[in-house]
Each structure stands twice: as C-alpha cells, then as structure tokens.
Curated annotation (Swiss-Prot):
GO biological process, one term: translation
Sorted UniProt keywords: Ribonucleoprotein, Ribosomal protein
Listed InterPro entries: Ribosomal_protein_uL29, Ribosomal_uL29, Ribosomal_uL29_sf
Protein name: Large ribosomal subunit protein uL29
Protein origin, superkingdom: Bacteria
Keyword Magnesium appears in the UniProt entry: no
Stored Pfam families: Ribosomal_L29
Any single Gene Ontology cellular-component annotation: cytosolic large ribosomal subunit
Family: Belongs to the universal ribosomal protein uL29 family.
MF GO annotations: structural constituent of ribosome
Length: 73
C-alpha cells in the first residue's frame, strides 16, 4: 500500500477534512488496541495512518493560518 499523497488531502473541503481527521484518529486507536492485544496482522498500517494523519493536520493548520500552497510548493 503506497503512502498517501498530500494533494489528496488538499483537495478535501473543510468539513471533509475534519471528518477524515476524526476517522483516521479512530482507526489509529483501533489499530493500537489490536497491537496491544497482539491481534494486529499488518503492523505497517499504523505507520501509514500516522503519516496520513500528519498530512491532514498539516493541511488543516495551513488553512487556519491562511496559507494556501502554490503549484511550485
């Protein structure tokens, strides 16, 4: 499974972005719970979800600060 692209996160509306952040946090919690109980078969999913969450939070922060990236960035 490839790493998610930040362009995908930037294409979301503000409401979709908030919903996606909530969904990824919930999924990350469930993955950590599975890891703690030794039921996690695909441990790489934790890394992918953390990466996606970081991208989503970065985009949210950019929007709050009013910074809109250009195509060169």
């Amino acid at each position: 499974m490839p790493m998610p692209k930040i362009a995908d996160a930037r294409a979301l509306s503000d409401e979709e972005l908030s919903n996606e952040i909530y969904a990824v946090k919930k999924e990350l919690f469930e993955l950590r719970l599975q890891q703690a109980t030794r039921q996690l078969n695909q441990p790489h999913l934790i890394r992918l979800r953390k990466h996606k969450l970081a991208q989503l939070l970065t985009v949210e922060g950019e929007r709050k600060r009013g910074k809109r990236p250009t195509k060169e960035e």
